[in-house]
């Protein structure tokens, strides 16, 4: 993938860029793997906003991705196409199995149309192949990792992300996550070799608010720009800094939201680099 920069023909085009989609080999998705996808607008079943800044955007259909890959062990598959998926930053690969089945998987970097991929404990160590962590050599870069055996991939699924297998210790495999955290995961969990493709996705400059609206992202209004009835930072004579530590519209302090005594903390070998703390 490469980034194509626009010429500044309009204010919205100035500085904006777009992916060139050179790796895409087919524009029409596999119909048997499509599902309807309705929009919530960030509302719950009572019509109340539960997640702000969501609404509108282009209509989409969901592509069913195989995140488990545990029922085709030993069955080779050919990469028929690399496709665009509007529901994620990564590209997806359409696999045609020898038994006639068709599946979508996340397309790792380097996977091309016509390649052969496989899954199972005896699979080769090459991009796109899926194996249990206990069968993967230490030092290998992987993505789409399960947290529970058979539970489906949960870690490293977005464009350009990857995890390194740094050690094996009894029933556990130690993984270094993109955040820097080193974590134990059950060695029976599966992972896919390589890193997720489309790594330059993060370098795209969207250029104008309208392109974000096409994605279904609504504006984020600063609290200091609101009235005091709407936000704790609102009001004041002239422009102000808010006058207190940053909080949400409901007074919740900004910072870490993860519970400090989570059950899975015992699996963390080394913490990630510390972020903002709540005061």
From Swiss-Prot:
Biased composition, class Basic residues, residue ranges: 269-279
Superkingdom of origin organism: Bacteria
Entry keywords, A to Z: Ribonucleoprotein, Ribosomal protein, RNA-binding, rRNA-binding
Protein name (database record): Large ribosomal subunit protein uL2
Lineage: Bacteria, Bacillati, Actinomycetota, Actinomycetes, Micrococcales
Positions of region (Disordered): 29-53, 224-279
GO cellular component: large ribosomal subunit
SUPFAM superfamilies named in the record: Nucleic acid-binding proteins, Translation proteins SH3-like domain
Primary role: One of the primary rRNA binding proteins. Required for association of the 30S and 50S subunits to form the 70S ribosome, for tRNA binding and peptide bond formation. It has been suggested to have peptidyltransferase activity; this is somewhat controversial. Makes several contacts with the 16S rRNA in the 70S ribosome.
Pfam family, one: Ribosomal_L2_C
Keyword presence, Acetylation: no
MF term (GO), any: structural constituent of ribosome
Biased composition (Basic and acidic residues): 253-268
């Amino acid at each position: 993938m490469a980034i194509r920069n626009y010429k500044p023909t309009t204010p919205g085009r100035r500085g904006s860029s777009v992916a060139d989609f050179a790796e895409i080999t087919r524009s029409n998705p596999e119909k048997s793997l499509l599902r309807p996808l309705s929009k919530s607008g960030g509302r719950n079943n009572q019509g109340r906003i539960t997640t702000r800044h969501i609404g509108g955007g282009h209509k989409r259909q969901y592509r069913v991705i195989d995140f488990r890959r545990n029922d085709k062990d030993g069955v080779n598959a050919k990469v028929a196409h690399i496709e665009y998926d509007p529901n994620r930053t990564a590209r997806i690969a359409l696999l045609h199995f020898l038994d006639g089945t068709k599946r979508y998987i996340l397309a790792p970097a380097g996977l091309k149309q016509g390649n052969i991929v496989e899954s199972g404990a005896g699979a080769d160590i090459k991009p796109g192949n899926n194996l249990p962590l206990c069968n993967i050599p230490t030092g290998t870069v992987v993505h789409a990792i399960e947290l529970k055996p058979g539970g489906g991939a949960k870690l490293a699924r977005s464009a350009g992300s990857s995890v390194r297998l740094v050690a094996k210790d009894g029933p556990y495999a130690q993984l270094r996550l993109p955040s820097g955290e080193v974590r134990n995961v059950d060695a029976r969990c599966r992972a896919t070799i390589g890193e997720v493709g489309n790594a330059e996705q993060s370098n795209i400059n969207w250029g104008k608010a309208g392109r974000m609206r096409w994605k279904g992202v609504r504006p984020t209004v600063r609290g200091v720009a609101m009235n005091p009835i709407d936000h704790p930072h609102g009001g004041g004579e002239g422009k102000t800094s808010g006058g207190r530590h940053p909080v949400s519209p409901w007074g919740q302090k900004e910072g870490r939201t993860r519970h400090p005594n989570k059950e899975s903390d015992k699996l963390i070998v080394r913490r990630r680099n510390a972020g903002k703390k709540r005061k």
